[in-house]
Design a protein with these regions (language model features):
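Catalytic machinery of carbohydrate-active enzymes
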Residues: 1-324
Length: 324
């Protein structure tokens, strides 16, 4: 047909080469070239960890293509001063005169199959950062996202460790009933103040706080960053606070059986489920975010949350002994 528009179903970055022939003769050729042009990249997630994992690759895209990037995140203030060459805009705001537009996220069809028009590879089989890198057509290298600087006076003699015990699903929690208490007791006995920086309070979704911790008062995320920067380490689960600690270059101990040991950042002290235990449901199946007690393999049985129940306090303390 003549005089018609056409659009490719693929929505991730492909450096297209388009050739149009007439009677076997090349009539028109166009090669993708974003240099000097305006490209819009949107973060599809409100989650702290997702934003911290992904924004670095928006900058890598800008540098690769030497283009003008307009990015939308739900926490622009965290990044705007560290990425002066990116124009940050509020999600939902109109952006005009664009050469290309991409959206970073985990996309599924109604039947829970992966939307391979938006994700070039099943995102469950990739690290959180490689998933973003793939959507933006980049060669993957782990990059630590830069976030706003804090003017914090660091006392090298201060013996403080931050912990974050809560997440957005019970499967993300460290479900060993004595795990946190044993680790807090060990730290207290070594003279460390243990600062709890999770915003949730005691008995949140039936989860008790360990004794011997100092609860950081709820407030701006910047104050949590300050406490982390003062600390010798952060101990957390597969949540945004672990990504925040890692982004701040604070030694990060990450306890998770919900995901496989390759799913988050590599430069951390990672404790996973012992060999032979059920693990990695997040990297095998689509998370049902509406089911707080989602445990697709063993829900309702004695093996529910086996992955993190089987992670012992001794396993965590062994990692802490490497640098505390």
């Amino acid at each position: 047909k003549n005089n018609c528009w056409c659009k490719c179903s693929i929505e991730y970055c492909v450096e297209w080469k388009i050739k149009i022939y007439e009677n076997d003769k090349l009539w028109y050729e166009y090669i993708y070239n974003a240099k000097g042009k305006r490209v819009y990249i949107a973060m599809d997630s409100r989650a702290l960890g997702d934003s911290l994992a992904w924004v670095a690759y928006v900058e890598e895209f800008r540098k690769k293509h030497q283009c003008e990037v307009i990015a939308s995140t739900f926490m622009n203030d965290m990044f705007i001063e560290q990425y002066p060459n990116i124009t940050f805009t509020t999600p939902g705001m109109g952006v005009e005169n664009l050469y290309a537009m991409y959206c970073v996220g985990l996309f599924y069809n109604d039947d829970s199959s992966v939307n391979l028009f938006k994700n070039p590879i099943d995102p469950k089989t990739q690290t959180m950062q490689k998933m973003c890198s793939d959507i933006l057509g980049l060669d993957f290298v782990e990059v630590r996202t830069k976030i706003k600087k804090r003017n914090v006076k660091i006392d090298p003699t201060l013996k403080q460790v931050c912990i974050g015990v809560f997440g957005t699903a019970q499967s993300k929690f460290w479900n060993n009933p004595t795990g946190w208490q044993d680790v807090v007791d060990w730290l207290n006995n070594k003279g460390y103040t243990v600062k709890l920086v999770s915003k949730e309070g005691d008995d949140y979704m039936g989860n008790k706080l360990p004794n011997g911790v100092v609860k950081h008062p709820n407030g701006p995320l910047e104050l949590v960053m300050d406490e982390m920067l003062k600390s010798k380490a952060f101990i957390g689960i597969g949540s945004g606070l672990s990504w925040l600690s890692w982004s701040l270059n604070v030694p990060t101990v990450l306890i998770s059986g919900f995901s496989y040991d390759w799913a988050e950042m590599t430069d951390c002290y990672r404790i996973s489920a012992p060999k032979g235990k059920c693990e990695g449901c997040f990297n095998r199946l689509r998370l049902n975010a509406s089911d707080w007690n989602w445990c697709p393999d063993h829900k309702g049985t004695e093996r529910q949350f086996e992955c993190t129940k089987s992670i012992t306090s001794e396993m965590v303390i062994k990692e802490l002994e490497k640098f505390l």
